[in-house]
């Protein structure tokens, strides 16, 4: 673990079933996470290739997915090992090479001490939460590969959230907060530390301001970690899938009801318009009067 303080890089020969691995993307701006299940295969959660954050802007292509579809896109032939497993999005399984997409391999650490956690200034590399056994982790990952992990969300339900859930079985209950992702928690803590208005009243020197800002950043990261959050609860994977399916069914029913209501409203509007047109026609062209008598 001491070596992991400087780098979480690991050789693929040292991987074990159930390991949470990741690889940095776009010059270390963000990382893509997954669960290693053995035989150089990885299960991970992704949005459609080229739509990682779904903003409809150039950022979608900048933050690319690590799905087999992304790796086999363009003129290059599909991967001989996992090309037949291609899915457009959701929970996917791919070989380790496609997952890494040319990047280096890193191991996410669990059950670290508070001192180690704070020493790793970059979020999304470790957590204070303890990991379950490798078999339990692999079971969750395979179950979600078959059943799905819900809708992808950069802030609530991303690839790191998926991997952390598989490792710990922990979910965040609070609706108005970021998910389990250490990357997003780190970013949120940084913005909060810089934007906190009391900073200018706590110190008058540049050095003091840096110390206060660093302190607030560390506190923000620590209280957001899944290992210390009070709103984190253990949820069996079968229960999670059942809840997700029920929510999706309810949303589909709501959308269908809204669509039906809109169709009925449009039909009534069309009928009213037809009646109004007919009334106008009678006004403009009154029936002819018989003057023969």
Regions inferred by a protein language model and the residue ranges of each:
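Cysteine-nucleophile amide-bond enzymes
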Residues: 1-293
């Amino acid at each position: 673990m001491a070596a992991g303080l400087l780098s979480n890089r690991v050789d693929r020969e040292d991987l074990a079933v159930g390991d949470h691995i990741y690889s940095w993307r776009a010059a270390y701006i963000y990382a893509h996470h997954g669960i290693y299940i053995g035989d150089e295969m990885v299960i991970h959660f992704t949005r459609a290739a080229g739509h990682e954050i779904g903003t409809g802007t150039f950022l979608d292509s900048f933050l690319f997915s690590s799905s087999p579809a992304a790796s086999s896109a363009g003129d290059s032939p599909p991967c001989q090992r996992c090309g037949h497993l291609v899915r457009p999005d959701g929970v996917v399984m791919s070989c380790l090479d496609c997952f890494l997409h040319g990047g280096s391999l890193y191991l996410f650490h669990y059950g670290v001490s508070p001192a180690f956690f704070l020493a790793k200034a970059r979020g999304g590399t470790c957590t204070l939460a303890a990991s379950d056994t490798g078999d339990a982790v692999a079971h969750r990952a395979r179950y979600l590969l078959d059943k799905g992990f819900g809708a992808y969300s950069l802030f609530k339900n991303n690839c790191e959230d998926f991997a952390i859930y598989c490792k710990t079985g922990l979910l965040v209950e609070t609706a108005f907060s970021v998910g389990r992702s250490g990357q997003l928690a780190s970013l949120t803590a940084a913005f909060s530390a810089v934007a906190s208005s009391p900073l200018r009243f706590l110190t008058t020197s540049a050095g003091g301001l840096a110390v206060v800002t660093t302190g607030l950043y560390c506190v923000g990261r620590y209280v957001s970690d899944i290992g210390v959050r009070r709103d984190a609860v253990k949820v069996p994977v079968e229960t999670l899938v059942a809840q997700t399916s029920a929510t999706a069914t309810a949303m589909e029913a709501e959308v269908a009801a809204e669509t039906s209501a809109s169709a009925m409203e449009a039909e009534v509007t069309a009928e009213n318009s037809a009646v109004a047109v007919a009334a106008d026609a009678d006004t403009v062209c009154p029936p002819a009067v018989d003057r023969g008598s």
